[in-house]
C-alpha cells in the first residue's frame, strides 16, 4: 500500500489520483469528515479531482454516512479493512490518502480500539470547562488519540471519554494486522500553507459554504451536531444561528484552520518519532515530478 499524508491544502488528493491512474488502482480516504454526505464544500471533497484521462478514479470511504451521524475510529477501522480487502482481492495495491493522522496511524499499526460507551459521570464533570482546559486534559493521556480534529468542547469531551476508557480497559487485540506501506508526506512551508488556506477559505465562501451549512440546518440537522464537526461547520453554524457576525466568523475560522494544519504536522512528526518512515516530498513540485518521485520509491520498495 502507498499512504499519502500531509496538512490541509497541500495537494494530497491530486497526487493520490495521479498515482492511482498510473498504477491502475483505487484510493481509500483517511479523512474524518469526508465520510459525510452533503458536507462537500467544507470538507474539500473536490470530487472533480478524481477525474483523470477520461477515467474516474474510485475513492472509498467518501459519502458513506449521513450528515448528523457520529463516526469514530472504531467504525473507520472496520470500513477501511473492508475496502482494503476488496481492493487487494482484485489484485491492486491500495492508496491511502488523507490528513486524519489517527486514522492513518491506527490502520498502519493495527490498533484495535473498542466501541466506547458514553460515560455520563465523566461528561458531567467536564461540562463547563473551556476548550483550552479540555485540550490540556486530553493531552495528558498520551499520543493515542486524534487531537488534530478536536476543535469544539463537545468533541474534546468525547475524546477524553474514549481516552479514559482505554486507560481503564487496555486493549491489545490484534484483530487488525499491521500494514506495510510506503508513506509519502507532502511538505509545504508555513507561509505558503497559510496563504493557500486563506485563499481556499475565500474560495469556499464564494462557492456556497454558507448555503451548504444552511441547507444542512434546514434539513433538520441540529446546530450542535454541525458544531461538533468543527472548522467550517462549527463557525458557519455559529454565524447562521446569530452567535457571531460574518467578520468574526471568517477570522475565527481562518485562525482555526491554521491551528488545525499545525496540529496535523505535529501528529505526523510524532509518527516519525514513533517509528514510521515518512518520505517527504516538496508539495510545490509539479504533479508529474511528485508522481515520478513516488514511483521511484515504490519501485525500490517493491
From Swiss-Prot:
GO biological process entries: tRNA modification
Q: What is this protein called?
A: tRNA dimethylallyltransferase 2
Residues annotated as binding ATP are 6-13
Q: Identify the stretch(es) annotated as Interaction with substrate tRNA.
A: 31-34, 154-158
EC class:
transferase
Spell out the molecular function terms from Gene Ontology.
Answer: ATP binding; tRNA dimethylallyltransferase activity
List ligand-binding residues for substrate: 8-13
What does the UniProt keyword field contain? ATP-binding, Magnesium, Nucleotide-binding, Transferase, tRNA processing
Cofactor(s) it depends on: Mg(2+)
InterPro entries the UniProt entry points to: Dimethylallyltransferase (IPR039657), IPT (IPR018022), P-loop_NTPase (IPR027417)
Q: Which family does it belong to?
A: Belongs to the IPP transferase family.
**Which reaction does this enzyme catalyse, per its entry?**
adenosine(37) in tRNA + dimethylallyl diphosphate = N(6)-dimethylallyladenosine(37) in tRNA + diphosphate
Q: Its quaternary structure?
A: Monomer.
UniProt site positions, description: Interaction with substrate tRNA: 100
Write down the species: Porphyromonas gingivalis (strain ATCC BAA-308 / W83)
Q: What does this protein do?
A: Catalyzes the transfer of a dimethylallyl group onto the adenine at position 37 in tRNAs that read codons beginning with uridine, leading to the formation of N6-(dimethylallyl)adenosine (i(6)A).
HAMAP family in alphabetical order: IPP_trans
Superkingdom assignment: Bacteria
Q: What is its EC number?
A: 2.5.1.75
Amino acid at each position: 500500500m502507498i499512504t499519502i499524508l500531509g496538512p490541509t491544502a497541500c495537494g494530497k488528493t491530486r497526487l493520490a489520483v495521479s498515482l492511482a491512474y498510473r498504477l491502475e488502482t483505487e484510493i481509500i480516504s483517511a479523512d474524518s469528515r469526508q465520510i459525510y454526505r452533503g458536507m462537500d464544500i467544507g470538507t474539500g471533497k473536490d470530487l472533480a479531482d478524481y477525474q483523470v484521462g477520461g477515467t474516474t478514479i474510485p475513492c472509498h470511504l467518501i459519502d458513506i454516512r449521513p450528515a448528523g451521524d457520529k463516526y469514530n475510529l472504531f467504525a473507520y477501522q472496520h470500513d477501511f479493512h473492508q475496502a482494503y480487502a476488496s481492493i487487494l482481492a482484485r489484485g491492486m495495491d491500495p492508496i491511502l490518502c488523507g490528513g486524519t493522522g489517527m486514522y492513518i496511524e491506527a490502520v498502519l499499526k493495527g490498533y484495535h480500539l473498542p466501541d466506547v460507551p458514553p460515560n455520563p459521570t465523566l461528561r458531567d464533570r467536564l461540562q463547563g470547562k473551556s476548550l483550552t482546559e479540555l485540550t490540556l486534559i486530553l493531552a495528558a493521556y498520551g499520543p493515542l488519540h486524534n487531537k488534530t480534529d478536536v476543535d469544539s468542547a463537545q468533541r474534546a469531551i468525547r475524546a477524553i471519554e474514549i481516552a479514559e476508557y482505554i486507560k481503564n480497559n487496555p486493549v491489545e487485540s490484534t484483530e487488525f494486522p499491521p500494514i506495510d506501506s510506503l508513506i509519502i508526506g507532502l511538505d509545504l512551508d508555513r507561509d505558503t500553507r497559510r496563504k493557500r488556506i486563506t485563499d481556499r477559505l475565500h474560495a469556499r465562501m464564494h462557492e456556497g459554504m454558507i448555503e451548504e451549512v444552511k441547507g444542512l440546518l434546514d434539513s433538520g440537522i441540529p446546530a450542535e451536531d454541525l458544531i461538533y464537526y468543527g472548522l467550517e461547520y462549527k463557525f458557519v453554524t455559529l454565524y447562521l444561528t446569530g452567535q457571531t457576525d460574518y467578520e468574526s466568523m471568517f477570522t475565527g475560522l481562518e485562525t482555526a484552520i491554521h491551528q488545525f494544519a499545525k496540529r496535523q504536522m505535529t501528529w505526523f512528526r510524532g509518527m516519525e518519532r514513533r517509528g514510521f518512515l515518512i518520505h517527504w516530498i516538496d508539495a510545490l513540485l509539479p504533479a508529474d515530478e511528485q508522481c515520478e518521485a513516488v514511483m521511484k520509491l515504490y519501485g525500490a520498495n517493491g
